[in-house]
Amino acid sequence: MAAKDVKFGDSARKRMVAGVNTLADAVKVTLGPKGRNVVLDKSFGAPTVTKDGVSVAKEIELKDKFENMGAQMVKEVASKTNDEAGDGTTTATVLAQAILNEGLKSVAAGMNPMDLKRGIDKAVIAAVKEIKNISRPCEDSKSIAQVGTISANSDERIGNIIAEAMEKVGKEGVITVEEGSGLEDELDVVEGMQFDRGYLSAYFVNNQDSMSAELEDPFILLVDKKISNIREMLPVLEAVAKSSKPLLVISEDLEGEALATLVVNNMRGIVKVAAVKAPGFGDRRKEMLQDIAILTGGTVISEEVGLNLEGATLDDLGTAKRVVVTKENTTIIDGAGAKSDIEARVAQIRRQIEETSSDYDREKLQERVAKLAGGVAVIKVGAATEVEMKEKKARVEDALHSTRAAVEEGVVPGGGVALVRALQAVSDLAGDNADQDVGINLLRRAMEAPLRQIVANAGGEPSVVVDKVRQGEGAFGYNAGTEAYGDMLEMGILDPAKVTRTALQSAASIAGLMITTECMVSDLPEDDKKGGMPDMGGMGGMGGMGGMM
């Protein structure tokens, strides 16, 4: 085992706080409407320009191991806030830096670190309660657009496009962000269920303009196996032909004789048909087939439950108002499934979301909920250059997370005002001893830090602004964008309550751990010579060569 470098007390904390300050100083320049950009060098391609706190934090690694430990712990604050609320990473970093710096001053003055931490924890509980009290629901499109605008660094177009997307697909609907091909942002909305499987043969296409197979009021056959023998399909195919309705076949795969027969029937006009592979893989495919069955009021023909294709009747088939199959996607619009069955299925998937520990599984389950409950909206981000495209896409994703958080827990006045208003609840607190009181007071000072930083980035005088905001009431605050005082809610400067709450809780949690740190252990720096080849010495003289001719 390698030898370790161990540091104690003040010398450890000084190195740790130096790392914290390096990272926090890089992140906090991005805060507020007049925050600056940070340029990140990449090992390949053009540098990335960003105003996203967590993107900046993730890039920072420090050479000194003890400083790096401090930086990594603050990085954890930004990441945790981003994972939970989707935004507020810069605010959380500024808060953590302020709490830590204030806390270490108190520790140096002889306070008990554990009591300081208890005081901070008490104050956080009171502040979070007050943030919840001053929040108000965010339900109308205008509020959603305002939250999106603020999170996207005051870009109104992004706020409006997110509000429009949420209006069209509902609060539960899936909204995805993609890189567009033009200069303008676009919004595509897909109603009904869409999955990423296209037609198995181009001969199914019946709309040459859009190169798609469009089926009006079709039957939908769902089969959980590979179909290659047409004999199995004949009974159900004949029944569909008699009904004169189109047919969509969704199966694990369809090949050989079975596919050829369907193509011939379609081209001769005997049965209007299209075939696609089932979405997903393995167990997820089985679940998604079941989702489609519930949405369309059909039954999955699966040998696992004793059903076979030869015995299938029209009663086993689902129906929908319309189906559109392109080369890459299949969209089922207005399935005929019972609303109560769909709601029960959605509730079942939501329970699975709560129980799963895998982020990937959770994301896939949420997609399934959205496909059953609402539609799918795609925001295509437009920009002039690749660098701008990446920066803008990151801002749109941030804004989308923020609006979801706002819908979940409501909104509070933005621009650091909510934390200043929550100070009142903290002011009335008393600790069990003098050191806890110091912890409560240091959190009070730290809660002003985001507002101070917003004003500083805008070129204002932080102390003057904080004093004036503190004297005001309710949503009264300072708009750094226009350098005017007024009602933050009326000016449309809103923050999701969840973002403000998570930022404060994450920052206090990590800063509390750092304040109570007494010892740090790290690997010793490696000696550059270590591992090289040993010195081979000179080769010496070659001596007389004798009489070479």
Swiss-Prot record:
Its main location: cytoplasm. Gene3D superfamilies: GroEL, GroEL-like equatorial domain, TCP-1-like chaperonin intermediate domain. CDD domains: GroEL. Keywords: ATP-binding, Chaperone, Cytoplasm, Isomerase, Nucleotide-binding. It is an enzyme of class 5 (isomerase). GO terms for cellular component: cytoplasm. NCBIfam families: GroEL (TIGR02348), PRK00013.1 (NF000592), PRK12849.1 (NF009487), PRK12850.1 (NF009488), PRK12851.1 (NF009489). This is Chaperonin GroEL. It comes from the Bacteria. One of its GO terms (molecular function) is ATP binding. Forms a cylinder of 14 subunits composed of two heptameric rings stacked back-to-back. Interacts with the co-chaperonin GroES. Belongs to the chaperonin (HSP60) family.
